[in-house]
Regions:
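Amphipathic alpha-helices of TPR/Sel1-like and other helical repeat/solenoid scaffolds
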Residues: 3, 26-44, 70-85
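A conserved position within tetratricopeptide repeats
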Residues: 41, 78-82, 117, 151, ...
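Terminal, low-structured helical/coil segments at or just beyond the last alpha-helical repeat
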Residues: 133-169
């Protein structure tokens, strides 16, 4: 009988071989890898990389197969990822990125990026993404406010400095 750690090691090695260990990923490999990630997450639901890679693969399948069912499946797992990993900025930022890039719902993306910024471990890039979203939606006031908030946490952030200067001309 394999231990939990041995099973995880074998699953991750299989994923690595299927996804990165061959020169060309074959038709049908992504669904196999997705299922392997689901097995990994049954054993280790806190594995943030597994969640993010699996969701990315589902999004990729939606594009490659032109099948929105994969995208809706990815959305379901993105929400599940956040519910299991609600502490820290990373899951909130990832779900924000999911809605910004994959589902293209800027309103929801903004909500999740704003939630990510409540955490002290949020990096400058999270602020940058949110500023960009505010500007894309035409909300200059919130973009300026976000730049100022960013500079309180990261006083030497060149992006925030230049963007704030540009916006307050």
């Amino acid at each position: 009988m394999q231990t939990r750690e041995q099973k995880l090691k074998l699953l991750n090695k299989t994923i690595e071989t299927l996804w990165h260990g061959v020169s060309d990923t074959k038709e049908g490999d992504y669904p196999k890898i997705i299922n392997l990630y689901k097995e990994v997450l049954k054993l280790n639901p806190k594995d943030k990389d597994a969640w993010e890679n699996m969701i990315w693969l589902m999004w990729s399948m939606a594009i490659n197969k032109k099948d929105t069912a994969w995208l809706f499946e990815a959305e379901k797992f993105a929400k599940m990822y956040l519910s299991i990993n609600p502490n820290g900025y990373r899951a909130f930022e990832y779900v924000g990125q999911f809605y910004r890039i994959m589902m293209v719902d800027e309103r929801l993306a903004i909500r999740y990026y704003e939630s990510a910024l409540r955490w002290k471990d949020a990096p400058e890039t999270t602020f940058h993404s949110l500023t960009s979203l505010y500007l894309k939606r035409g909300d200059k006031i919130r973009a300026i406010g976000n730049c100022r908030f960013n500079l309180k946490r990261f006083p030497n952030d060149p992006y925030a400095k230049s963007k704030l200067k540009e916006l307050t001309k």
